[in-house]
Design a protein with these regions (language model features):
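Compact beta-sheet-dominated domain cores in extracellular/mature segments
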Residues: 1-69, 73-80, 91-93, 293, ...
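Catalytic-core region of carbohydrate-active enzymes that cleave or remodel glycosidic bonds
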Residues: 214-269
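Active-site groove signature of glycoside hydrolases
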Residues: 118-141, 164-170, 190-201, 230-234, ...
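N-terminal carbohydrate-binding/catalytic regions of secreted carbohydrate-active enzymes
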Residues: 66-124
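Alpha-helical scaffolding within the catalytic cores
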Residues: 84-92, 106-117, 147-151, 169-185, ...
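Active-site neighborhood of glycoside hydrolase catalytic domains
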Residues: 148-162, 224
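Aromatic-rich peripheral "rim/lid" segments of glycoside hydrolase catalytic domains that contact
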Residues: 97, 101, 241-242, 246-247, ...
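Aromatic- and acid-rich polysaccharide-binding/catalytic face
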Residues: 128, 177-220, 227-240, 274-277
């Protein structure tokens, strides 16, 4: 649960191993900032003017040092993934092997009235593919309207979690850039940007080229949004993409291998999750059982820790400081 405060906070020390969200409104909405003390104590000597002596809400969770590799449509245990999500908010409890990430799939579902502390959930993904007319998120936003998503955003802020923007398709560049700009203008908080990617590459025998194409696509979004990127669905093409360049199982394995090594070497890319069920030659597991070459490679792959702590300027230290640990 979040703590409701009287507002007289201008500085604080967040101990290493915790994340805290501070907000102007008692329900967690309004101007807010999420802080993470991953690699050392975080000392904030002066809050921004929009929060200084105006903090009404704080929610604090233990931080988890999660590696980049994740899963979505396949069990995290089957891929030795470090985190996963399932397009829902289910009764998952904290697990020492992998982190469960919640999602607000569309505007009306699922409910965010949750006991986040009990569930051990620290991250929340925004709407799923609101730029895609076949998705519920598109319909629930009256045809994927960015303005409606921004107006509804305080509900997500109220959870007090680290919030991801709506996850668009790989054709949704303009949509995601638009919502980032509108959210910033409205004072809404977006902490990272999820994205989906299913593009093939013209040369099926050039895995490095496929990896560079993915990197350049993500770099364009990062340069526009200036926020960490999560690749929450991806594969080397799909059944709705360019069938003339469909890979065989070996070519798919090699392309995904090159892609995830490129992602591991990209500091602003926090997390990625393979999506398997896009034709048998792209799957992590065969329909009849057994793991594919790509699935085995992905399972064996060891990825680095995703989050990179950035220490903001501490400024001058006011006379009062608050050392935050864990609140219930």
């Amino acid at each position: 649960h979040g703590a409701v405060l009287g507002g007289d906070i201008s500085s604080f020390v967040l101990k290493r191993g915790y994340t805290a969200t501070l907000s102007r409104n008692a329900n967690g909405s309004g101007f807010s900032i999420n802080y993470v003390a991953a690699d050392g104590d975080l000392r904030i000597g002066a809050l921004p003017a929009n929060l200084n002596n105006q903090v009404r809400f704080i929610r604090i969770f233990p931080w988890r040092w999660v590696a980049k590799k994740g899963s979505c449509d396949v069990s995290p245990a089957a891929l030795d993934a470090h985190w996963y999500y399932n397009w829902n908010i289910t009764s998952q409890t904290a697990n020492s092997d992998y982190e469960y990430v919640a999602i607000k799939q569309q505007r009306w579902w699922p409910s965010l009235n949750q006991d986040w502390q009990h569930l051990g959930i620290h991250h929340l993904l925004g709407y799923n593919e609101p730029d895609n007319p076949v998705e519920d998120a598109y319909t629930s936003l009256d045809g994927g309207r960015v303005s409606i998503a921004v107006a509804a955003w305080p509900e997500l802020e109220g959870a007090g979690l680290r919030i991801g923007a709506p996850a668009v398709t790989d054709g949704g560049y303009n949509w995601i850039v638009d919502i980032i700009h509108q959210a910033e203008a409205a004072g809404r908080r977006v902490d990272y940007v999820p994205i989906h990617y299913y593009r093939s590459y013209w040369n099926k025998n050039d895995p490095a080229g496929a990896a560079d194409q993915l990197y350049n696509f993500l770099k364009g979004i990062y340069d526009a949004a200036h926020k960490p990127i999560w690749l929450t669905e991806f594969n080397y093409g799909a059944y709705w993409t360019d069938n003339a360049h469909d890979p065989d199982v070996t070519q798919n394995r090699n392309a995904i291998d090159a892609m995830i090594h490129k992602l591991d070497d990209t500091p602003w890319l926090e997390r990625y999750a393979i999506y398997s069920r896009v034709e048998w030659f792209r799957q992590t597991h065969y329909d009849g059982g057994g793991i594919t070459p790509m699935g085995q490679m992905y399972k064996d792959h060891e990825s680095p820790i995703g989050y990179q702590q950035i220490l903001p300027g501490e400024g001058m230290h006011p006379s009062a400081q608050y050392a935050f640990c864990l609140l219930y």
